[in-house]
UniProtKB/Swiss-Prot annotation:
A GO MF term: aconitate hydratase activity
Keywords associated with the record: Iron, Iron-sulfur, Lyase, Metal-binding, RNA-binding, Tricarboxylic acid cycle
Coiled coil stretches, renumbered: none
Listed SUPFAM superfamilies: Aconitase iron-sulfur domain (SSF53732), LeuD/IlvD-like (SSF52016)
Organismal lineage: Bacteria, Bacillati, Bacillota, Bacilli, Bacillales
Gene3D superfamilies on file: 6.10.190.10, Aconitase, domain 3, Aconitase, domain 4
Name this protein carries in UniProt: Aconitate hydratase A
UniProt keyword annotation of Calcium present: no
Family per record: Belongs to the aconitase/IPM isomerase family.
Known function: Involved in the catabolism of short chain fatty acids (SCFA) via the tricarboxylic acid (TCA)(acetyl degradation route) and probably the 2-methylcitrate cycle I (propionate degradation route). Catalyzes the reversible isomerization of citrate to isocitrate via cis-aconitate. Could catalyze the hydration of 2-methyl-cis-aconitate to yield (2R,3S)-2-methylisocitrate. The apo form of AcnA functions as a RNA-binding regulatory protein.
Length: 901
């Protein structure tokens, strides 16, 4: 039998007396399939992953050949991706860890070895999403906010802390340490792994998936990774692949360098604008060209972070000498850096600007010298505004038609004022365009010492000139790691930021994800009473309407330097390039140019205070550096003691009644239609993340468990409780089910009695009768966020199959991984064209002979006995997915496989 690609590609190299195994990309070139130098670097990383992990079942020669022929006409197919590690944040991480704990309990219930239930690849959870800015502009803000954070989240934190003791290969970075993507960049990422595989030291690229869309930040250091939904992350943890189509790769050729006055933030916002115009949704983006060498690694990370905003799967910068320089700066060892360079050179993945450019699907060019100081807003990150145009842009937006770039108000808005009477007796007046929130926030920018120290220098010059921030501006500084605090301190700049109210409020996402906390009551009242259009300026990555604060209607993304400058001005209705920010101590006007540092000032400051020693010191004890976390009372027992009275964390019912052997693929008979929907049903329609209504099934459940309405919290915060989440499935207040005409929200008709009732109530009645359910849908079913509960909830309601005209990629995959059969109408056919109104009994003639993308016969029996028959495509996209389905889902398959070992 001929050797497969894995065997052909296995090679060795020696470094410092040690031999390393690796899998050489040239193996595909030697077979005459492709020239490796023609492949984009991101595709090379994927190809290495396939070569090294080929097993002739999940990953085959065919996958390797298909990916190797990247860029060739008509080359389609899917790539199985098995990342080398997984990162989680606490919002999305809780349900993933709940599933692991539930797997353990299920293993114990059937007498299996519970130690077999552990992540198979390293998992790091960073707790960063829960801190809110309650206290600010004072020296005690950090401690006060952290205390409140622990009080609000104690049960969740107790659970996550227990998991660190219970599971191998799982670590949690405590609250008040940093933001997941910055901790990943500065500490967790190895760029190249060395692991013992079959007794050999094997080198291979660091790759990952993360349960947060901005996981792409790590692409800045040449590590391939992106955000996924929870089920896909769990699959990765348990050694299972995720699948995606062979991507197009758009090359962005960078030339020249940034001019004086322009920052990495300005460049990232410009890239977002250009790539949104280009259209890169679902594609890889890779940066190359002579301009790359003029970008420090921190600038690259800022650009890569915003890949979700420009719509790409990733924004990749291949590893080069600048990457190695950053590794040294952040305290990685010289020995490891030498290994990274040697391995990547040996395996044709080290970027050199002098080498021939790869072949990209398409190329666009960006001249860095044309970037200028900018903001984005008022409602979308891709809506770029040059600083010079900001005043006119804001004024135009006030009266522009309501939409992404307008508020639909009239000119009288500019005459509005709100008088504020502070509790200390002082007074202030807020006008249209005044700034309610100015936040230095988000890993997008706080990972970048150039813009952070730049902001500190702006603050220093402003304080020395005698400028102050108006009392109505809520100011905050929330860096993504403690290293930032260290270098601002060592540069002597933090006191100047403190003088302006930019005191440290926490280490976490804060304002960037909407955890901006309340404004002062007197300010909130004044804004609400006058219905005043106020603004925020933040160094974040998203500014959708209502995201930052419910009362703040216009939100602008900007560099930390501009956040400080606008806070001083107190309004966005100003031309900062030509109008004074304020008056100095001497009574003279002070302009932006008077407080803006030069490129040399910033660079000299960075060089003097950002050192390897600082990174080594701050990350030395990263998993145990928070006393409140260390004091959490948890047992070290390997099984989690689920509290039946908890409304946040419950043992999900996925494994109840699990048989020892998997099922077989059998016909589905007598199904009733629970939902009939049109096009573009999103995962948010299927599983909302927001507020829980008091009269909904989920609201009634919480009230039955003595939870006051004011403490309902959101569906998102209760993702660890399947009882809440299943009641919230198809419960979005805006979903329209054609089976309950005249209603909006989660209602259906229960056919045995023709009653209209909540979908959850009907589903439970069908379950009592032993009746399976079906959902009929149009195009793009499951589009939007990769929300795992959209598939989990569908499963728990008893839905056996969804028949849609087309699916969004991740939701289709999630349905299979939850044991729900995705069927697709033939092109040109739909429920309506076939005359299906939802009253029918549905049967699907499927059995073990089916193969991926086969057509099966579906029969719909009308109430009068007439039959409608049609063919539907089985949307299993691989043989592995058929196994998931036989087992009832990926978690059930993992459990049975572990039992069989």
């Amino acid at each position: 039998m001929a050797a497969n690609f894995k065997e052909q590609s296995k090679k060795h190299f020696d470094l410092n007396g040690q031999s390393y195994t690796y899998y050489d990309l040239k193996a595909v070139e030697e077979q005459g399939i492709t020239k490796v130098s023609n492949l984009p670097y991101s595709i090379r990383v994927l190809l290495e992953s396939l070569l090294r992990q080929e097993d002739d079942f999940v990953i085959t020669d065919d996958h390797i050949k298909a990916l190797s022929q990247f860029g060739k006409d008509g080359n389609e197919g899917e790539v199985p991706f098995k990342p080398s590690r997984v990162i989680l944040q606490d919002f999305t991480g809780v349900p993933a860890v709940v599933d692991l704990a539930s797997l353990r309990k299920a293993m114990d219930d059937v007498g299996g070895d519970i130690t077999k239930i552990n992540p198979e690849v390293p998992v790091d959870l960073v707790i960063d999403h829960s801190v809110q800015v309650d206290s600010y502009a004072n020296p005690e803000a950090l401690e006060r906010n952290m205390k409140l954070e622990f009080e609000r989240n104690y049960e969740r934190y107790q659970f996550l802390n227990w998991a660190t003791k219970a599971f191998d290969n799982y670590n949690a970075v405590p609250p008040a340490t940093g933001i997941v993507h910055q901790v990943n960049l500065e500490y967790l990422a190895s760029v190249v792994h060395v692991r013992d595989v079959d007794g050999e030291k094997t080198a291979f690229p660091d790759t990952l998936v993360g349960t947060d869309s901005h996981t792409t930040m790590i692409n800045g250091i040449g590590v391939l990774g992106w955000g996924v939904g929870g089920i896909e992350a769990e699959a990765g943890m348990l050694g299972q692949p995720s699948y995606f189509p062979i991507p197009e790769v758009i090359g962005v050729r960078l030339v020249n360098s940034l001019p004086q006055g322009a920052t990495a933030t300005d460049l990232a916002l410009r890239v977002t604008q250009e790539l949104r115009k280009k259209g890169v949704v679902g594609k890889f983006v890779e940066f190359f060209g002579p301009g790359v060498q003029h970008l420090p690694l921190a600038d690259r990370a800022t650009i890569a972070n915003m890949a979700p905003e420009y719509g790409a799967t990733c924004g990749f910068f291949p590893v080069d000498d600048e990457s190695l320089k950053y590794m040294k700066l952040t305290g990685r060892s010289d020995e490891h850096i030498a290994l990274v360079k040697e391995y990547l050179k040996q395996n044709h993945m080290f970027f050199d600007v002098e080498k021939e450019d790869p072949n990209y699907t398409d190329v666009i060019e960006l001249d860095l010298s044309t970037v200028e100081a900018s903001l984005s807003g008022p409602k979308r990150p891709q809506d770029l505004i040059f600083l010079s145009d900001m005043k006119s842009s804001f004024e135009n937006s006030v009266t522009a038609p309501a939409g992404n770039q307008g508020h639909g108000l009239d000119k009288s808005e500019f005459d509005k004022k709100a008088e504020i009477n502070f509790k200390d007796g002082s007074k202030a007046t807020m006008k249209t365009g005044d700034i309610a929130i100015a936040a230095i926030t988000s890993c997008t920018n706080t990972s970048n010492p150039y813009v952070m120290l730049g902001a500190g220098l702006v603050a220093k010059k402003a304080v020395e000139k005698g400028l102050k921030v108006p009392e109505y501006v809520k100011t905050s500084l929330a860096p993504g790691s403690k290293v930032v605090t260290g270098y601002l301190r060592d540069a002597g700049l933090q006191p100047y930021l403190d003088d302006l109210g930019f005191n440290l409020v926490g280490y976490g996402c804060t304002t960037c994800i909407g955890n901006s906390g309340p404004l002062l009551p007197e300010i909130e009242k004044a804004i609400a009473d006058e219905d005043l259009l106020v603004t925020s300026v933040l160094s974040g990555n998203r500014n959708f309407e209502g995201r930052i604060h419910p009362l703040v209607k216009a939100n602008y993304l900007a560099s930390p330097q501009l956040v400080v400058a606008y806070a001083l001005a107190g309004t966005v209705d100003i031309d900062l390039q030509n109008e004074p920010i304020g008056k100095g101590n001497d009574g003279e006007d002070v302009y932006l140019k008077d407080i803006w540092p030069s490129i040399k000032e910033v660079s000299d400051t960075v060089d003097s205070v950002v050192t390897p020693e600082l990174f080594i010191e701050e990350y030395n004890n990263v998993y145990n550096n928070n006393e409140l976390w260390n004091e959490i009372d948890v047992t070290d027992q390997p099984l989690y003691d689920f509290d039946p009275n908890s409304t946040y964390i419950q043992n999900p019912s996925f494994f109840q009644g699990l048989s020892k052997e998997p099922g077989t693929i059998v016909p589905l008979n007598g199904l009733r239609v629970m939902g009939k929907f049109g096009d573009s049903v999103t995962t948010d329609h299927i599983s909302p993340a927001g507020a829980i209504g008091k009269d909904t099934p989920a609201g009634k459940y919480l009230q039955d468990h003595q939870v006051p309405i004011r403490e309902f919290n959101s569906y998102g915060s209760r993702r660890g409780n399947h009882e809440v989440m299943v009641r919230g499935t198809f419960a979005n207040i805006r979903i329209k089910n054609q089976l309950a005409p005249g209603t909006e929200g989660g209602f259906t008709t229960y056919w045995p009695t023709n009653e209209v009732m909540p979908i959850f109530d009907a589903a439970m009645k069908y379950k009592e009768d032993g009746t399976g359910l079906v959902v009929l849908a149009g195009n793009d079913y499951g589009m939007g966020s990769s929300r795992d509960w959209a598939a989990k909830g569908t499963n728990l309601l008893g839905v056996k199959t969804v028949i849609a005209q087309s699916y969004e990629r991740i939701h289709r995959s999630n349905l299979v991984m939850m044991g729900v059969l995705p069927l697709e109408f033939k092109k040109g056919e739909s429920a309506d064209s076939l005359g299906l109104d939802g009253t029918e009994e549905i049967s699907v003639n499927i059995d073990e002979n089916v193969q991926p993308h086969d057509y099966v016969k579906v029969t719909a029996k009308k109430q009068d006995g007439d039959l409608v028959e049609f063919d539907a495509m089985v949307r299993f996209d691989s043989l592995v997915e058929m196994d998931y389905y036989r087992h009832g889902g990926i978690l059930q398959m993992v459990l049975r496989n572990k039992l069989a070992q």
